[in-house]
């Protein structure tokens, strides 16, 4: 078993071949974190890792002559009020106004497999041998409250997952005001913090900062989503860690709402990482026999650099977070009509676009916004999930049938969490809006947020959209969400329960996803939130792909997809070839480069193919054929490697290598041409050093061994780049092992 409890030293050792995580019961009954890092040999006693010394101003939490102080101890789950003056993982308001808590060890359970988290997405196992789990139960006798810390370690991944659960056993009501999912402490501060930051159309840019004493944090208060501004992920890496070497610790939050990821460095250079639901705007009352479960944090340890961390997340999320029919299944090549028509379409126009899509080999046609209610613009119609017969006289059922008769699958866009005031839904249920009755209701994109914290709202939307799906032949649903929450107040909740609203909203979204995916298990769901404002592990549990960004410009997508790959597998990244000039930046990039970027994702088109020249249509046909030939490798069977960062220079490169190292596809992208440019060699990664490969690109072919391709590299033809497409040139390499 990869979790052992050593009774004599009261130590838990959680480990596999990749990592060790060691925690122990201290003399005051609280838990201490002794070590987290590269796997070390198991033994009875690691108590030498506990450090204790008399310091001025410290509060000692054991009888004299003891020296145990929480201020200088690497705690497993720090709380408020017993002498630790750093931020706590847990804040509980009691009936007498006190926030002092003291949870002491009571018992533990070690078991095979991994339990589900009630109402929440989480990683999972399919048999007990895949992982081992540990529940440590702590108890506060004054409140008569249990705190259960849950750990799971996978057998084959460098992963430990963490969550916490509070159970109120006593008669008094307690109010949770801060409940982190995880706290981990490191003995030094020699780290750099990586986070993925941005905004609409420039999501998940890679940011790195050196840790300093004090607090550094990223967060979301968006309410409806994890946000474009900050992704629910951070990593700590050693200063000399690269993409391929060195230590890195990743923390990824399996949640889609408000979050806080915080790193606090003490004046003694100890580093505390905490991650969980953002305490701002959150409070949760527990009465006797009630409990609260936090979402899960997935921690990855890598001693093989950032690529090693990312590949661990990719494999785990692809294999044990995504579920259902589309887990480990290549995605259909689609065409979405949004940038081709926006709201201006009718059945004839849609059928003409779909017909051309079929001619080039596309497999799925997706009808985007504008098909329902009075939805002729974004001022009206949201909430009314019935067909606009003026645009589609034969309804979705008739249109989907005609699309299928062409030999295409049919997909549909929805935005189920939102409502326009100009809608039948709002006129019938004005109290279903999130918003305080005595405050102005802020609007965004002319729409408002439905109160998904209320079960009757979720029921109504479920019934409405299920009817549309049942009556039609739908293979794919794009579930959009186009605004953050403001005035977070539920008209269906009491004053005491308003602090539950934003978390209950996300639980309502999960509930609707659960009901729809269970009722329609064959449908491929893609999540979307004004592009990538809710690209998080919580969504991937229900929808195995996410629209990566509303920015479809190929050059910008290099940055967005590069940053996204730090955590998320490329099969989860919605990526399309769009028209030029690009609709977001008005930039023109070569058709080949647009495809060469989009290949490293789900791949599809977002334009009217009828507007392309005959030569361009032939190029599109070749692109579709290439993707069909290589999508199993790219999306399902391969490991993704980052090679050159768009955040560090003019060039970007990445590649996918099959697990058996027999096949690979690599992309190289040059943003701006340079006059009389210097020589450059592209060094591949992940190949078998002793294997002879055939490399093809453009009109060239080369045979070389893996060690040549990885260490000597392959020259990039700068002159060819200058003579062909000008700026934004790219090269696609296919690599095949020779017998």
Whereabouts are the PLM-identified features?
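Short Pro-Gly-centered flexible turn/kink motifs
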Residues: 98-105, 284-303, 728-735
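C-terminal beta-sandwich/jelly-roll accessory domains of carbohydrate-active enzymes
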Residues: 672-739
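Carbohydrate-binding surface patches
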Residues: 234, 243, 646-689
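Aromatic-lined carbohydrate-binding/catalytic grooves of carbohydrate-active enzymes
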Residues: 326-460, 476, 486
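Polysaccharide-binding surfaces and accessory modules of carbohydrate-active proteins
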Residues: 5, 9-13, 17, 31-264, ...
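Conserved, mostly hydrophobic/aromatic
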Residues: 18, 164, 289, 335, ...
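Glycine-rich, aromatic-flanked loop segments that form ligand/cofactor-binding clefts
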Residues: 71-72, 76, 81-117, 245-258, ...
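Active-site neighborhood of glycoside hydrolase catalytic domains
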Residues: 393-395, 427-429, 433-588, 602, ...
